[in-house]
Amino acid sequence: MSESLYSIRMRSSCDERHISGAENLAPAERLHALASAMVRRALAHDKGQAEQIFLSIEKVDTADIVCHGLPDIRTIRVASVEQGRDAALSMLEKAGVNPQAARRAMATMARGAAPNGDSMRGAMLVDASTGQRLEKDRYRGVRVSRMDLDEQTSVRLKNLLQTAGLDNPHVREALVLAAKVIHAPGVIAELCWSDDPGYTAGYVAGASLGYVRFPLLKPAGEVRGGRAFFLSSDADLAQLIPYLERQVVLIDRIGRIFPDERWPA
């Protein structure tokens, strides 16, 4: 790869409460437009207008970039939040997560995984066998960063998602993050639903599952959300956390979208 890339990241908050975040990998000529778009996003978010906006831009060593493909996409239609969570638990068990560990993590996310009952800024790390939480900071968690689609793959993904009626920022950004996470050493599966009050969908992702969407994983208006990464018992956190937080990953291939399914099948 000959073109120089920069990692541009935004996070915003209000009264020490996380409002929004965004990030891209981009050449220098796109940085101004991306920075403007990120600031607009922080100032016009469903969770409120940010009072603090932090932008970070750093040049990426192209020799350090790792390329991955996106997972296949499945959507499982459910009739209620309860049904959606049952379906998600079933997918986590299928991926190799102990059912009790999955239920424990889901209950923690539902009541707010941070010690004060709010959403964490990053993800929980959960032992997939025991359910034990492994992250050191239960407010911050582990923040996955430095990943994006290459330009051609971005266009292809947008066209594919438009055809399926799924083209929105939540899906695009979640797919990219999930692609990085499921390639991480020691990760068995990911559970996620958004902390945006107007977005009720969530997903389970794993190397063996792909990306499995559920339109209802939380009630409308709920601001508690987050991520749980389920780890094998022999996962090396000293290797895993730097990969999630600092390894630059560029997505250069899209997956397939399968027809919607209904739960129960």
Curated annotation (Swiss-Prot):
Do the record's keywords include Magnesium? yes
Residues in a coiled coil are none
EC id: 6.2.1.14
Keywords in UniProt for this one?
ATP-binding, Biotin biosynthesis, Ligase, Magnesium, Nucleotide-binding
Give, as in the UniProt entry, the pathway in which the protein acts: Metabolic intermediate metabolism; pimeloyl-CoA biosynthesis; pimeloyl-CoA from pimelate: step 1/1
Membrane-spanning residues where?
none
| Enzyme class of the recorded protein, top EC level | ligase
The yes or no answer to whether the keyword Nucleotide-binding is present is: yes
- Cited Pfam families: BioW
Q: Select a single GO molecular function from the record's annotations and give it.
A: ATP binding
Record field: catalytic activity:
heptanedioate + ATP + CoA = 6-carboxyhexanoyl-CoA + AMP + diphosphate
The cofactor named in the record is: Mg(2+)
Domain of life of the native organism: Bacteria
The biological processes this protein is annotated with in GO are: biotin biosynthetic process
Give the family this protein belongs to, as stated in its UniProt record: Belongs to the BioW family.
Q: What is the purpose of this protein?
A: Catalyzes the transformation of pimelate into pimeloyl-CoA with concomitant hydrolysis of ATP to AMP.
HAMAP family hit by this protein: BioW (MF_00668)
Name of the protein this chain belongs to? 6-carboxyhexanoate--CoA ligase
Species per Swiss-Prot/TrEMBL record:
Syntrophotalea carbinolica (strain DSM 2380 / NBRC 103641 / GraBd1) (Pelobacter carbinolicus)
Q: What is the lineage of its organism?
A: Bacteria, Pseudomonadati, Thermodesulfobacteriota, Desulfuromonadia, Desulfuromonadales
